Regions:
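Low-complexity, glycine/serine/threonine/alanine-rich intrinsically disordered linker
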Residues: 1-443
Length: 443
């Protein structure tokens, strides 16, 4: 474009160019930006986020970004490394250039390194204090004065042995994490033989580990420190708060899935790939269905009866296809109307049905025993010695039910089988990986 130097058009073009440069970083205009000192560089971390800060982030986000850069500077100790890098750059660049061009850089780099080292020393007491604060979280209670003094003395002893600060702090962390107070959830009993209430910190630990399988958070610790957690209203409110948190997934996994014996289904490799080639790709989804179902029960305060008669479940696209359900998306979603499809509750999970089956066929005995012992709490005696193991596949001419009935006719086994087999036969409408069926492998 051709314009006169002093023309209005030139001013308009320059204003438009300035606006473009203000909105688009240079990286958008060039495929690659190569630093002049590409072989040996003095800049350890290049920051170019002015456009991001100015155009996209609010004040809080800018402050957080600046904090992260400062944290990177601290962790990397870049001002100290730049002293060594400068010497390498100086030796490299002055082989065929005038050294005087680089000398003005030496003193500012040295001054920044000296100031940074002084700052590191000033931070040492605060970092030791942070480890002690961490100990109160790790040990799930406030430190008593003797414990705090012992940890401080350990740090001082390590420094007197000429260990650098960073190494001494790492060992101090290790001391906190190998303490019995971290490794075990101990509760201090009162003298005598009578039962007594746990204190607030112990109650916070019980609640948090039961619901989250993890240590109490800041809010629980604060209430425990204030002596308020044993107030029934406060305890109830905190229980509901923890239940609504995403960490309740751990209760669904560690309690719900473990109770149903499907905690490890996602790694189950006992199914015959010849008979069930799709199982390996679905087993993780099967376990996830159980997790999401239990989370829904916990977070929505559903009736305990819904474990058996719920009319809904949670599936993604592949699992819905496995069940024969039609869904409009591949993502995880709730579906209703299961009872009309012959399912509902934990007895209709592919996870439970697959886990209590053999490698290539269903097992009414396994399913019935699981339902009797795990769901109903009716413990069965061990089977008598010498009872033959059922074949993995039903012999020709026998249905899977007939195979089970023939095995159960042994008088040594009949009393138990009369209790469990009807439960297992009731689930024969599902195959060994939980798909609905109207006939077994024998027809």
């Amino acid at each position: 474009m051709i314009v006169n130097d002093a023309s209005l058009e030139r001013q308009q073009f320059e204003a438009a160019f300035d606006e473009f440069r203000a909105l688009f970083p240079i990286a958008l205009c060039y495929s690659k930006i190569v630093p002049v000192d590409e072989v040996v560089t003095l800049t350890l971390f290049h920051r170019e986020d002015d456009h991001l800060k100015r155009l996209m982030l609010d004040g809080t986000q800018v402050a957080e970004l600046d904090r992260l850069w400062e944290e990177l500077r601290l962790v990397s100790e870049s001002p100290l490394k730049e002293v060594d890098v400068f010497e390498q750059l100086y030796q490299f660049a002055t082989q065929d250039a005038d050294p005087s061009a680089f000398e003005p850089m030496r003193e500012p780099i040295r001054r920044e390194a000296v100031a940074f080292k002084k700052w590191l020393i000033e931070l040492e007491p605060a970092q030791v204090s942070a480890v002690l604060d961490f100990a109160t979280q790790a040990w799930r209670r406030p430190l008593v004065e003797s414990e705090r003094a012992n940890l401080e003395a350990l740090y001082e002893s390590l420094r007197q042995q000429e260990l650098p600060h960073a190494a001494a702090v790492r060992l101090l962390f290790a001391r906190v994490l190998v303490a019995p107070d971290f490794l075990y959830r101990g509760e201090k009993a009162t003298p005598g033989t009578k039962a007594s209430p746990v204190n607030d910190f112990e109650l916070a630990t019980r609640l948090s580990y039961f619901l989250w399988a993890s240590a109490p958070d800041d809010e629980l610790r604060s209430l425990a420190a204030a002596g308020k957690l044993r107030d029934p209203a406060v305890l109830g409110a905190q229980t509901r708060r923890l239940m609504q948190d995403s960490r309740i997934r751990r209760l669904a996994t560690e309690f719900g899935c473990q109770w149903l014996h499907v905690r490890d289904l996602e790694t189950l490799d006992e199914k015959s790939e010849r008979h069930f080639p799709t199982f390996a790709g679905l087993r993780g989804d099967m376990q996830e269905e159980a997790v999401r179902f239990f989370m829904d029960v916990f977070q929505n305060d559903r009736s305990v009866l819904s474990l058996l008669n719920a009319d809904h479940t949670f599936v993604n696209g592949p699992l819905a296809g496995h069940y024969g359900f039609e869904v409009t998306a591949e993502t995880w979603q709730r579906i209703d109307g299961l009872r009309a499809k012959g399912r509902g509750g934990i007895l209709g999970f592919a996870a439970t049905l697959a886990k209590q089956s053999g490698a290539s066929r269903t097992s009414p005995i396994l399913r019935g025993t699981w339902l009797s012992e795990v769901i109903l709490g009716d413990k069965l005696p061990n089977p008598p010695k010498g009872v033959p193991v059922l074949p993995e596949e039903a012999p020709e001419g026998l249905t899977e039910r007939q195979l089970t009935e023939r095995h159960s006719s042994d008088e040594r086994c009949a009393s138990c089988h009369r209790r469990v087999d009807p439960f297992g036969f009731a689930l024969e409408g599902f195959d060994a990986i939980g798909r609905a069926r109207t006939k077994d492998a024998a027809g």
